[in-house]
């Protein structure tokens, strides 16, 4: 079964041609870096031996005072100035004297769903064996850092899936927060007016709860209340969304996980699926146009990768016409979700339609990026602004022990989402 194409055809083809052309004409410089952290970090400050403090990793598009915020870019690393202040989202962590152990790797300007970074190196997916598997982007280093135990919690950003996709690829937990909940001051932008969010990642739900408590004061108490209100899955009603193109093994794993958790599960109607598909397209349009609005000054800079330039130039083709058209449909999509959440507590679907893809030994990476973009089920959530949780669940597969369940909630339902994630996690064998 073929996957959905979510880009305007002419713009898509032009962007592809640009990327293929430029990629074949440039040889990227590679920054030398220690392999001890598997490229998870751009800057790493290892904690002392036997340190008992919470270790927090921060994606390198979030300002840390005194450090250049590279946004995953050679050009910015070499020309940027150290941040004069911490990003606002670090305020609680600083108040509590949480140990920040480094700035994590990411896709350049957060614009790649694969997590590949030609300059800083691509973080190694823990499931890589004979073939290197994509770590997922753009918060690739944040996902691999918590998986490898090099941080207890990592902060990532999510404009179109950039927390949930790497969480899915690397088998960790990632939370996309409600749009506007966490301040974006001091965060390198993609589309900050409608899409950009900051969210926590961890090896399990408990660590993500800790991460949310560092982003929102009083969150731990709200989470405890959510657990007390609905301690079991039998009290939670789930709307199950099935999407064309999904690997049957993944759908089976999700249905089994929901059954083990004893959720009340009801299938969502075909009409909702059609609206979801349109929201995915509109969200992608806004993300690409946002890249042009935020990053157009880098489109001709030496040191910015050709694939990144292609995405920025694609945004130029989509802005303002298709961008404004998508924006006009946003309220209707939010209303559609609002109506669904009158009937269910959460929506469940795969984070990715297929298992994480291998990085080709030879061939154009642009084609890989396009394929990843077309198998992630994340952008419609950003388009609406709702929160969503990616949590690993067991799967019967020859190469991967887990796949990723995505749960979508009402605005500001992060505590309830994590309670549902806890139930799923506890029910896993």
Task: List each language-model region with its residue ranges.
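Bacterial N-terminal signal peptides
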Residues: 13-21
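Bacterial N-terminal signal peptides that target proteins for export
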Residues: 2-13
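Short pre-catalytic strand/loop immediately N-terminal to key active-site residues, enriched for Gly-Thr
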Residues: 76-83, 123-137
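Short helix-loop capping/hinge segments that flank enzyme active sites or metal/cofactor-binding pockets
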Residues: 53-76, 282-334, 390-401
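Structural helix-boundary/capping segments
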Residues: 27, 99, 148, 153, ...
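Serine-dependent amide/ester hydrolase catalytic core
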Residues: 294-383
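Gly/Ser-rich, acidic/histidine-flanked active-site/gating loops
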Residues: 56, 62, 68, 89-95, ...
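Short, well-ordered alpha-helical
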Residues: 24-82, 86-87, 107-112, 356
């Amino acid at each position: 079964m073929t996957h959905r194409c979510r880009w305007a055809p002419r713009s898509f083809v032009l962007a592809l041609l640009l990327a293929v052309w430029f990629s074949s004409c440039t040889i990227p410089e590679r920054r030398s870096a220690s392999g001890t952290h598997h490229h998870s970090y751009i800057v790493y400050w290892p904690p002392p031996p036997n340190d008992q403090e919470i270790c927090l990793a921060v994606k390198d598009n979030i300002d840390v005072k005194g450090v250049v915020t590279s946004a995953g870019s050679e050009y910015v690393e070499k020309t940027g100035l150290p941040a004069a202040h911490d990003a606002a989202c670090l305020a609680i962590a600083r108040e509590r004297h949480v140990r920040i152990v480094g700035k994590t790797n990411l896709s350049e300007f957060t614009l790649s769903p694969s997590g590949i970074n030609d300059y800083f190196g691509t973080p190694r997916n823990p499931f890589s064996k004979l073939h290197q598997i994509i770590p997922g982007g753009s918060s690739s280093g944040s996902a691999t850092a918590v998986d490898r135990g090099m941080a207890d919690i990592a902060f990532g950003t999510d404009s179109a899936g950039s927390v949930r996709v790497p969480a899915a690829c690397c088998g960790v937990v990632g939370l996309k927060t409600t749009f506007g909940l966490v301040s974006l001051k001091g965060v390198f932008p993609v589309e900050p007016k409608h899409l950009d969010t900051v969210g926590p990642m961890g090896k399990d739900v408990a660590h993500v709860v800790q991460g949310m408590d560092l982003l929102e004061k009083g969150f731990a108490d709200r989470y405890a209340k959510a657990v007390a209100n609905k301690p079991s899955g039998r009290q939670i009603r789930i709307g199950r969304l099935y999407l064309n193109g999904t690997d049957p093994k993944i759908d089976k794993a999700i249905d089994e996980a929901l059954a083990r958790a004893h959720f009340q599960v009801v299938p969502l109607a075909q009409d909702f699926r059609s609206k979801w598909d349109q929201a995915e397209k509109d969200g992608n349009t806004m993300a690409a146009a946002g890249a042009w609005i935020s990053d157009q000054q880098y489109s001709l800079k030496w040191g910015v990768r050709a694939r990144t330039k292609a995405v920025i130039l694609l945004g130029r083709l989509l802005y303002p016409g298709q961008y404004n058209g998508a924006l006009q449909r946003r309220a209707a999509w939010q209303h559609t979700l609002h109506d669904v959440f009158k009937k269910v507590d959460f929506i469940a679907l795969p984070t990715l339609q297929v298992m994480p893809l291998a990085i080709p030994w030879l061939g154009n990476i642009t084609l890989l990026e396009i394929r990843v973009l077309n198998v992630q089920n994340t952008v419609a959530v950003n388009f609406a602004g709702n929160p969503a949780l990616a949590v690993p669940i067991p799967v019967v597969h020859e190469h991967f022990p887990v796949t990723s369940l995505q749960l979508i909630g009402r605005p500001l339902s992060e505590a309830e989402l994590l309670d549902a994630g806890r139930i799923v996690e506890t029910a896993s064998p």
